[in-house]
């Protein structure tokens, strides 16, 4: 484990949780930026869905509530509805993902970000999110449950 990330290895995969961000149970991350928040998908989420091939965003300027859809993502494995970890107004979307959706897989905590939101009541929104350490523990439980389920299916 290094200073910037928490990491765990499952099978041959390394799952990373970046420190200094907030996380939602729906496997999105939130980064504070000058009163706005940048939202992206976690490493766990992108590994679970596989290679991302397409993403569709809402219009800039719309208001979103917590748990309301902010993107539709298509991967080689599934179609996923991505929901907002907080409430606010979408002020920007990552247009670069239209041409290179695979950036979500390649750089989930960097160039693979999804949307920029001007949050309503930032403090209240942040109180509903998890710290990196708490999300890391939740992710490990999810991974353990998936491994148990996989073991049952393979018997």
Model-inferred region functions:
Residues 61-76, 117:
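A structural signal for short beta-strand/turn segments enriched in small hydrophobics and glycine
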Residues 22, 56, 63, 74, ...:
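Small beta-strand-rich domains/subdomains or short beta-sheet motifs embedded
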